[in-house]
Structure formats: C-alpha cells, structure tokens
Regions:
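Short loop/turn segments immediately following the C-termini of beta-strands
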Residues: 71-72, 116, 166-167, 207, ...
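N-terminal export signals
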Residues: 1-18
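Blade-level signature of beta-propeller repeat domains, shared across WD40, Kelch, NHL, RCC1
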Residues: 322-352
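Short, conserved, GDST-rich strand-edge loop motifs in beta-rich repeat architectures
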Residues: 164, 257-282
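Surface-exposed loop and turn segments in beta-propeller and other repeat-based domains
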Residues: 40-49, 91, 130-144, 148, ...
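Beta-rich, blade/repeat-based domains predominating
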Residues: 48-63, 93-110, 138-160, 191-213, ...
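Residue position within the beta-strands of beta-propeller blades
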Residues: 68-69, 113, 163-164, 216, ...
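Blade/loop signatures of beta-propeller domains
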Residues: 16-40
Length: 352
C-alpha cells in the first residue's frame, strides 16, 4: 500500500540576508473594482542561499503566513510573511513539487503537496510528512503502466482528498481523509462534458446556497467544469483565450493564474472554443464574480462580452511570463507564482 506514515522532519536550515527592496511600482493594472499596484520584487531572496526554479503555487495559513511550493530541491517550500520576509524553508526531495493545498482540521493546518513524479504528500506546515498517496495501481484503479502525474488537490468538507491527475490520466481521483480510494471522477482526456484537456486544478466551491461543488480546470479547453462532490457534471465556465491553472475561491470571487493566452476560434452557435496555438510569456490573472462573469484581468485585456458571450482574453501588458497560481490575503492583495519565468520569485499585487 502506498499510503505511508512518516515521522521524519525534512527541514533545510536557511539564512535570510535582508536587503532593501524597491518601493512599490506606481503602475496600476486590472479593471473595474479590481485594480492593483505591481510589486515585482516583493518575494526576492538571496539566490545563493534560497534559490527557486519554478514557483508553482502558494497558500495562506491560519497564522497569515504565505507558503509557496516549487521544484527546487534546495528548498521546495518557502514561507513568507506579508512584507516579503522569509520566515522558513524546507523540502529537499520533491523534484516535481507542483501543487499545494492547505486544510485545517479545526485546530491545525496541514499541507497537501503534489509531486508530478507520482505522489501526493500530506505534511505539517513545518515539513513533517504524515501520509503519502502513490500510484493508483495500488488500489486497482489503473494499470501500472498508466501515467500518474498529479498536479493539484482539493480537500472536501469531510476531509476527502480530490487529486487532479492533470499531467497523467486527466481523471480526478477521490480518496478518504485516511487515503482509501473512493472513485475516479470524469471521463479522462477529451472534449465531452465529463472530460478534460489537462485537468490542471481542482477546488471546492462553497459559495452557493446548496451543496458544495467541485471546480475542475480543463486548461487546454480554456474552461472550468463544475461537478458534484460525487462526480456528476453540472456546467462549464468558458474563458476563451485563457489557459487557466487552478481555480482559487476567496469570498465571493474566483481567481486564477493564466499560464498563457491565445487567439481562439469560435464555433457558430456553440459556446465551445478552440485555441489556435499557445503563445509563450503571455500570462495574466483573471477574476470572476459569483455568477461566473469575468470582472478583471490584471495584466490582460479588459473582459468584453458580446451578446452574452465572453470574447477572447489575451495578455495586454508584459508584466508576467506564465502565471501558475494566485494567492489572496485577508486585505485582498494578490501574490502571483510563475512557471518558466527565469526563476522569478512571487510577485505581489497590492489592491487599490
């Protein structure tokens, strides 16, 4: 069985050499009520002591700390305060460190790290490993030869673990909080309602009056898809042109990093769109309201609707390379993590 308990703490000592950081930029990006000043150097650290490769995802813990995961095994996890000061770092073996979710059991915070090399690891916030979920073949779900490259997790109200196998099978796999397999959700890779083209992200949406639902990314199809927690398809939220990463809920709004953007082809009388190509270094952030309407695209074009149809969204300002995640603090500032961005540290967007 690949659900394993681990008692060891994997911690890397660090030395944080404080240097003066540039003042906040006067440049304002975004639209409507969601505008931000750009602070590109907010998360910069001494590269010799605390290097990064890809800054993949970030979460906010109950202490107000910002916790980031990346794929540099000198320090997979960086913990910042809101000023950009490094508080801690740990993790030396997550070569595919990619997804990061946080869950509180009522008293303590726990992290779920997705390593795209084939595992999901539950840890404490100081790096102690508590559980590992490995290849689904151990549960009779897939054959051993079936690729398993998890990209994201979401934790249900009862502690169930939903794993998006975004770089592998394109299913979402549901486990109990103790790591027992329940079901697989979706129909694998494809364009049908219950299928995904890169199931890159997943989150629990508690904003509605009814039961919580799953929002699952279909990145190459430029959309999120909504399912019940038991895996029944509900609806599609199209975001033409935007190769979105995971959905992030904060209050009534939905945020996502757009890894890159592209012109799309609209089908006559059909809400489905097809990207024509992917353009490198064309990322931005997109923000949707509770009804699923795009209200702001920091770094991107102003959202435009024609006859109720959202038009193609593209990068407008060359501030970002590839936005891989966005984290929101209690003051509604944004922190943007990037993939393939010349080893850039997280960028802060201050709400104005």
């Amino acid at each position: 069985n690949t659900v394993k308990a681990a008692a060891g703490i994997i911690v890397v000592p660090h030395f944080n050499i404080l240097t003066s950081k540039p003042k906040l930029s006067d440049e304002v990006i975004g639209h409507g009520d969601f505008k931000y000043k750009v602070h590109k150097s907010w998360g910069d650290l001494d590269r010799a002591m605390t290097p990064v490769n890809n800054c993949h995802e970030m979460v906010l813990d109950s202490k107000g700390r910002l916790i980031m995961v990346g794929d540099d095994t000198h320090n997979n996890v960086l913990i910042y305060d809101k000023s950009g000061k490094l508080l801690d770092s740990w993790g030396v073996r997550y070569k595919g460190g990619h997804g990061l979710s946080i869950w509180n059991d009522g008293s303590d915070d726990f992290l779920f790290i997705c390593d795209t090399n084939g595992s999901v690891i539950k840890t404490t916030t100081d790096g102690r490993e508590l559980m590992l979920i490995g290849h689904p073949s151990e549960y009779g779900v897939f054959e051993k030869e079936t690729p398993f490259h998890p990209t994201e997790t979401a934790i249900g109200p009862n502690g169930d673990i939903y794993i998006a196998d975004g770089y592998g099978s394109n299913y979402v796999l549901q486990f109990t909080k103790d790591g027992e397999f329940i079901r697989k959700i979706g129909g694998g890779r494809g364009i049908e309602d219950n299928q995904f083209l890169t199931a890159h992200g997943v989150c629990i949406d508690n904003r509605g009056k009814g039961d919580p639902t799953l929002l699952i990314t279909s990145r190459a199809a430029n959309c999120f898809k909504r399912f019940t927690l038991e895996g029944k398809y509900i609806e599609r939220i199209s975001l033409p042109g935007a190769f979105i990463c995971r959905p992030v809920i904060h209050n009534d709004n939905l945020y996502s990093g757009v890894c890159w953007s592209s012109e799309v082809v609209f089908e006559e009388g059909n809400s489905k769109t097809h990207p024509t190509q992917t353009n490198p270094n064309s990322g931005f952030v997109t923000i949707l309201d509770k009804k699923g309407k795009v209200v702001s695209n920091p770094g991107g074009t102003q959202p435009t609707y024609k006859k109720g149809e959202l038009q193609t969204m593209l990068q407008e300002q060359s501030i970002f390379n590839h936005c891989h995640d966005v984290c929101i603090d209690n003051d509604e500032n944004l922190y943007v993590c990037q993939w393939n961005a010349n080893k850039a540290y997280p960028i802060k967007l201050e709400r104005v």
